[in-house]
Structure formats: structure tokens, C-alpha cells
Amino acid sequence: MEAEITNATKKGKTVGKKRILQLLLAIALIGGSAYLLKGDVWTFWTWWLLAGVLGLCAMPLTGRLFQGFADKGWIFSKALAIAVTGFFTWFLVSIKLAAFTTLTCVAVVLIFVVCCILLFLHQSRQGIWCMPEGHGDLIFWEEVIFFAAFLMWTYFAGFHPQAYGTEKFMDYGFMEAMMRSTTLPATDLWYSQGKINYYYGGQYFAVFLTKLSVTKVAKTYNLMRTFVAAFAFAMPFSLVYQMVRDRMYGQLTGKKRCVPPMAGLTAGISLSLAGNGHYIVYRWVLPWIQKLQGGESDSGYWFPDATRSVSYTHLRA
């Protein structure tokens, strides 16, 4: 009996220390974001909280779709909620049943939340649990990863925030046009009285979140890009973590318990960071190799090449 009490006490102290460390890490991240982003941090926090609340509300739906996942699709729930509410807002505006305003965006979100609550109550009566019960630590670390990646890319974007180069000015112009418009498609900024005759889905969702959060395109233009980049880190982490966890089922003891999270981090780094390695290879590595071989260090580098076909690059003169 005394041994059980002693073990319970030790376990309680360990959990207490873990929670304190997690709290300190959360405070450090929030404080660090305030220091790095200065006045822009309020918009950053707003989008992060908005994604979190929407994702939480969508868990009755996401939890069923990802029922085999330990986290029940926690990170994916954020994107799913934005996609569903954004699409239905666009649909209602496109068929002229509603105006593209903040009020409409909020109304659609509230209807979505009510539907999710009703679904949650229905699932509860049937004994279906859609929340990641017993995996609080995993959810905490996924939120840390998402927040840290979002913060990192937002901070980097601040060094070159101008809407300059390739299609950036067009993207910014489309967003401003949709912010002013109450109909969709919005009036094209290039053609007087004409409508945007170009795919504008990405810009639309950026404006949807901008109107929903009552902010301005001047702040959210870059924020949307970094928001997507954060998902590009957190989603691969969640997916590969679960894949490795399932593959090693029954073997996750001792040091092997670190394998799934390390595999998840490797996936996030591979997509979010290594996926942007085109610049390093073609701008620095290949010219350096050419120089070592006695040739001219001429890379002919143009950064949009990363979005084009990579076939037959070995035949490039």
C-alpha cells in the first residue's frame, strides 16, 4: 500500500514538473512572438487563435474522418474548418444569396459551429468520442510546432514584405479588390468594370480570413503565405508521426518512443525547409561546383524556376 502511494506521489510530481515546463515553453513562445513581431503580433495572434477555435469546433467532424489517428486529426481540423466555412461563404456570395461582408463570414462560421455542436451531441449519445482523449501531450507539441513554424516564417517574411516580383502584386491587388467588393468574382483591378477572370481561390481564402478577423490586407497578405507554410510543417508531422506509430505498434518502449515524433519532425523539415532548397542548390551549390571544376560560375538562377518542371535539368547548357 505504501509503495503504491509512493509511486503515485512520484508520478504526480513528474506530471507536475512536465506541466510547468510546458507552461514555461508556451510563455516563451508567446513572449518571443511579441518581441519579434512587435505591433504586428496582434494580427498574428488573432489568426493563430482563430485557427485554433475553428479547428476545435470542427473536431466532431474531423475526429470521425481521422478516427484512427492518436490526435484525431487535430492539425487537419484547422484547415478543414477554414475550407468548409470559406467554401460555403463563397458559394452563397457567388449565387447572390449573401454579400461578401464580415457579417456574412461570421454568420456562416456560427452556423458551422452550431452544426458541429449538434453533431458532437449526437455522437456523445452514441458513445462516439471525437476528441484526442489521453493524448494531451501530443496535442500540446503539435500546437507548439504549428505556432513555432508560423512564427518563424512570419518573422522571415518581415525582412522582405513587399508585394514585388512575379505575381505578388497581382495577388495583393486581387485581395484588395475582394476586400472592397461585396460580390464575387470581384471587379478586376486591371480591367475597368470587368470581373476577375482568373483563378483566385488562394487569394479568396486569404480575404475570407481577413474579413473574418476584421484586419487589413496590408497585414494579412504576407501572413497568409506564412500561415500555409506553418501547415506545411505541422501536417506532415502529424501524418508521418501516425504512420510510424502504427508501423511500430507494440514496440514503442524505452528509447523507441522517440521514433514517431522524430520521424514527424523529419517530415516537417523535409517539406517546409528542404522543400525550399532549390535556391541553395541552384544559386550557391552548383556554381561553387562549376568553379571548382574550372568553369564559369554562372547559375542562371531565377527563383520561380522552383515552381516549373524539373525534367531534363541535366541537359541545361
Which residues make up each language-model segment?
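Membrane-embedded, hydrophobic transmembrane alpha-helices
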Residues: 2-137
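Active-site lumenal/periplasmic loops and adjacent helix-entry segments of GT-C-fold
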Residues: 41, 45, 49, 137-144, ...
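Polar low-complexity intrinsically disordered regions
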Residues: 1-17, 126, 248-258, 310-317
